[in-house]
From Swiss-Prot:
It catalyses: UTP + L-glutamine + ATP + H2O = CTP + L-glutamate + ADP + phosphate + 2 H(+); L-glutamine + H2O = L-glutamate + NH4(+); UTP + NH4(+) + ATP = CTP + ADP + phosphate + 2 H(+). UTP binds at residues 14, 187-192, 223. GO terms for molecular function: ATP binding; CTP synthase activity; glutaminase activity; identical protein binding; metal ion binding. Pfam families: CTP_synth_N, GATase. CTP binds at residues 14, 147-149, 187-192, 223. This is CTP synthase. It comes from Blochmanniella pennsylvanica (strain BPEN).
Length: 548
């Protein structure tokens, strides 16, 4: 099967939106009936982003097979139907580790190990393997052309021409065309210099995607075409839009998919973007709006909760409501109090996280939602703080806590997987080798829902598959005291020994999930839990307005 390769690089500045542009192009090609996948190459030395601070790097996106990957893979899954896996994200650290492992084994037979050919050959081998079974592979190279870290990756994609033929490769370069207010002009010089930098590496871009905050005129496109040696029809203008889900249509309207299909000699029907047109229609024709408070500790960088914020927007689209997300620092809840931080919300969501900082603010948020019948959705740590709060204030366990926060906790309602006991005080059979990542539960896990529960009603089925990323669990030894006080455990892992979902029946909508449903939400389908959560927020708003 012939595979065609599209390599996407970026220039001038970082954070131009290569990931979204790549995903949007993939969506248009997929809409033409092509089988498409995407690989992200990250130039940092970390093995994966799993241990990088969310404030520095953004969220860690978890794939079905449990890989901790770059947040761009979340964009890919939201735009195309192909599911990402561990081979869809490679870092420089992972590449170097593989090369060094082979060197220690003697695979190179005493050769001097160098960037060229050993590192570049490994990159090419992994790209070709990742493309297997697809019509088109798009490869996004992280970083900016000119960065020293990106050079091995750029050299590898330059060499791909000789590996798979020039007719099967295409280079797209994403650049910035800034508007200079003083002169009132868009400037093409940064794009020209960026292409010159790329040419010095040996790569002539076939297509330029020019980012700008306004429409790029015909004369400016001609100028870029002349100085960058790229055909005018291959100069794509990508101006700022109010919704990223409009970008597939923007690319199609400029004929980018036709140009690519012609270049690859692909005979396929016109792109059918009716799904995306429906998404945009509902997004632009809301019948109301609600405000959701998201209480977290990494709110200074919105990308730290990217999948959660997108899932809330998807649920808004499905309910035809605008979802206004108020980012609330959980430490502010502790310091400033509920009146100044949580008032005026239609729903409260506490997302996942690690560490003790800000936890008491999250517990206060769960308590406020429970006592005031405000819809509450706790994800991962958000479920755990809801359980701790209930244990302290309803189940008569004032010292309830997690061993993550208090090592010698007298009442450990949450504990490490290896510390958890069943209701008879016997350790649950988990060890460092039980799950991928040692004691970390990662990736898809089966969950069984109790019939008659709200969560079962929302999903409409008894068995679900959701993605996990955590190492602390509900301690079953203390669970009876909590459930006798009124909290329901309605979702369990495969062996029924790990709590996956909790509910508070004496509340309109109070759900906590140990898994991360946000990773399975897409703009076209949404996710049942998020859709139900926003529906509950709408109903709360209506009830609240009637009382006023």
């Amino acid at each position: 099967m012939r595979v065609n390769y599209i390599f996407v690089t970026g220039g001038v500045v970082s954070s131009l939106g290569k990931g979204i542009a790549t995903a949007s192009l993939a969506a248009v090609l997929e809409a033409r009936g092509l089988s498409v996948t995407i690989i992200k190459l990250d130039p940092y030395i970390n093995m994966d982003p799993g241990t990088i601070s969310p404030v520095q790097h953004g969220e860690v996106f978890i794939t079905e097979d449990g890989a901790e990957t770059d947040l761009d893979l979340g964009h890919y899954e939201r735009f195309i139907r192909t599911k990402m896996r561990h081979h869809n994200n490679f870092t420089a650290g992972k590449i170097y580790a593989d090369v060094l492992r082979k060197e220690r084994r003697g695979d190179y037979l005493g050769a001097t190990i160098q960037i060229i050919p050993h590192v570049t050959d490994t990159i090419k081998k992994w790209l070709i393997a990742g493309a297997f079974g697809h019509d088109v592979l798009l490869v996004e190279i992280g970083g900016t052309v000119g960065d020293i870290e990106s050079l091995p990756f750029l050299e590898a994609i330059r060499q791909m021409v000789m590996e798979v033929n020039r007719e099967q490769t295409l280079y797209i370069h994403l650049t910035l065309v800034p508007f200079i207010a003083v002169s009132g002009e868009l400037k093409t010089k940064p794009t020209q210099h960026s292409v010159k930098e790329l040419l010095s590496i040996g790569i002539q871009p076939d297509i330029l995607i020019c980012r700008s905050d306004r429409v790029i005129s015909n004369s400016e496109r001609k100028k870029i075409s002349l100085f960058c040696n790229v055909p005018k029809q291959a100069i794509i203008a990508l101006q700022d839009v109010d919704s990223i889900y409009k970008i597939p249509a923007l690319l199609k309207d400029q004929g980018l998919d036709n140009y690519i299909c012609k270049r690859f000699n692909l005979n396929c029907p016109e792109a059918n973007l009716s799904d995306w047109e429906e998404v945009i229609y509902y997004q632009e024709h809301p019948i109301g709006e609600v405000t959701v408070g998201m209480v977290g500790k990494y709110i200074e960088l919105v990308d730290a909760y990217k999948s959660v914020t997108e899932a809330l927007k998807h649920a808004g689209i499905k309910n035809r409501f605008i979802v206004n997300i108020r980012l609330i620092n959980s430490q502010d809840v502790e310091k400033l109090g509920i009146e100044k931080t949580l008032k005026g919300l239609d729903a409260i969501l506490v997302p996942g996280g690690f560490g003790y900082r800000g936890v008491e603010g999250k517990i206060l948020s769960a308590q406020y939602a429970r006592e005031n019948n405000i819809p509450y959705f706790g994800i991962c740590l958000g479920m755990q703080v809801a359980l701790i709060e209930f244990a302290r204030h309803v189940a008569g366990m004032p010292e309830a806590n997690s061993t993550e926060f208090v090592t010698n906790c007298k009442c450990p309602v949450i504990a490490l997987i290896t510390e958890c006991k069943d209701e008879n005080g016997i350790f649950i059979t988990h060890n460092d080798n039980t799950n991928l990542g040692g004691t970390m539960r990662l990736g898809n896990q089966a969950c069984y829902l109790i019939k008659g529960s709200l969560t079962h009603q929302i999903y409409g089925k008894s068995t679900i598959l959701e993605r996990h990323r955590h190492r602390y669990e509900v301690n079953n030894m203390l669970l009876k005291h909590i459930t006798h006080a009124g909290l329901s455990c309605v979702g369990f892992s495969k062996k029924n020994n790990l709590v996956e979902v909790i509910e508070y029946p004496n509340h309109p909508w109070f759900i906590g999930s140990q898994f991360h449903p946000e990773f399975n939400s897409t703009p076209r389908e949404g996710h049942p839990l998020f859709i139900g959560f926003i529906k509950a927020a709408i109903e709360y708003q209506h009830r609240h307005n009637k009382l006023i």
